[in-house]
């Protein structure tokens, strides 16, 4: 059952867990799907992009909304034929797929009007939008313009927009890029759609231990188990991005089953990945970030993989009583970020096993799995400005590897602000 899934606000893990069901096939392109599954709430700023994604799914097709506690938003008005489901997701999707293929359920019509992507009729010397050998918008599609190359040549440069639902990127991330072949010669990052207050995380997202720790005491064991699971979930997604989907599923199962003190399976996983030369070839030396560029950003594992012992837990007496010390790497590349998260997952499980009844003291900030989290923002907000300079000059494959290794979460800042606002209202 081919499904293209869009994880809305606060639903990242629930959508990820669908991969564990043998009846589900989450595909990487809408052209291979029959069902568009939308989980949670979608920012209004992404409604048009979601409609374009819907219209690129071939017939027969159906949109399914899985609310997961989220209220209906304005975006649903563009999907009048959608089906809402609450539970038994694989079974319901299987039934909808069967109805589509048998003709019992009609295919959904397009949402957007059938208009040209850009004016082209009667434009140019031949009336088809082109302006010569290069340039223009023939039949509404842009052609490559000549531009400078890193080797001093002038080659074709093609504009390309990637996101906001590209499966390898975090939901909401949009890159406006220019490519010469597969080389990124120019990159711009659009504004984070999750910080415009058009959507807030749903109730399930608001109950996460790191968000709660901003305003209330939380068990260290709960926090460290959640940290280890978050790192393993990242490993599972990163393996899928490296075309190692079967191994990624094994890691995802481990992430859902791991318990405090269970560090041996993670150590074994780290050894297996160390032997997997495919990962070494694709990550070693890729996306290197110097420590100076990360100083003071609270970038968590990304900073520690570049040699900065930057970790709020080192200032917490409860952690110091457990003998906690930050783990660091030296290389600062994608491979180091892989090693960093695996090492921290092992460390967190050991800490969770020894934490007993120790609890945090709320200070308004917390070391999340991705770095310093506070109501003013999460680590993704501080890393996004680095992306253009980091990616420009890279081959596309290395750029994807680099972005995956950063483990960006664009929703985190919005969710943290919403949690703090909710606590203020309640008081």
Go through each PLM region and give its residues.
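Metal/cofactor-centered catalytic core regions of large enzymes
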Residues: 86-93, 97-427
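Iron-sulfur-associated redox domains of electron-transfer enzymes in respiratory
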Residues: 1-118, 345
């Amino acid at each position: 059952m081919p499904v293209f899934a869009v994880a809305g606000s606060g639903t990242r893990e629930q959508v990820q867990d669908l991969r564990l069901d043998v009846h589900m096939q989450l595909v990487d392109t809408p052209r291979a799907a029959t069902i568009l599954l939308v989980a949670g709430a979608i920012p209004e700023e992404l409604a048009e992009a979601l409609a374009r994604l819907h219209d690129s799914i071939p017939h027969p097709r159906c949109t399914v909304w899985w609310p997961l506690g989220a209220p209906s938003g304005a975006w649903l008005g563009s999907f009048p034929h959608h089906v809402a489901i609450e539970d038994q997701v694989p079974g319901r999707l299987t039934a909808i797929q069967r109805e589509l293929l048998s003709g019992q359920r009609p295919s959904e019509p397009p949402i957007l009007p059938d208009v040209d992507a850009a004016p082209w009729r009667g434009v140019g010397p031949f009336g088809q939008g082109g302006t010569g050998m290069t340039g223009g918008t023939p039949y509404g599609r842009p052609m490559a313009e000549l531009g400078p190359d890193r080797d001093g040549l002038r080659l074709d440069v093609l504009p390309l927009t990637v996101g906001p639902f590209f499966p390898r990127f975090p939901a909401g991330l949009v890159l406006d890029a220019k490519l010469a072949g597969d080389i990124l010669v120019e990159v711009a990052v659009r504004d984070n759609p999750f910080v415009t207050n058009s959507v807030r995380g749903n109730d399930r997202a608001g109950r996460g231990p790191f968000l709660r720790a901003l305003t209330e005491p939380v068990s260290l064991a709960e926090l460290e188990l959640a940290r280890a699971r978050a790192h393993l979930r990242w490993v599972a997604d990163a393996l899928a991005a490296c075309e190692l989907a079967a191994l990624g599923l094994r890691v995802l199962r481990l992430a859902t089953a791991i318990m405090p003190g269970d560090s041996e399976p993670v150590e074994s996983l780290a050894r297996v990945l160390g032997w997997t030369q495919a990962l070494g070839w694709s990550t070693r030396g890729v996306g290197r970030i110097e420590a100076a560029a990360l100083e003071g950003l609270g970038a968590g594992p990304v900073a520690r993989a570049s040699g900065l012992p930057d970790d709020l837990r080192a200032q917490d007496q409860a952690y110091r009583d457990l003998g906690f010390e930050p783990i660091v790497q030296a290389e600062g590349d994608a491979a180091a970020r892989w090693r960093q998260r695996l090492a921290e997952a092992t460390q967190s499980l050991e800490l969770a096993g020894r934490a007993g009844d120790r609890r945090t003291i709320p200070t308004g900030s917390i070391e999340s799995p991705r770095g310093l989290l506070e109501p003013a923002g999460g680590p993704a907000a501080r890393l996004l400005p680095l992306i253009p300079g980091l990616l420009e000059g890279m081959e596309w494959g290395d750029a994807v590897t680099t972005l995956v290794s950063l483990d960006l979460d664009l929703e985190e800042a919005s969710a943290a602000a919403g949690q703090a606002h909710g606590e203020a209202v309640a008081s």
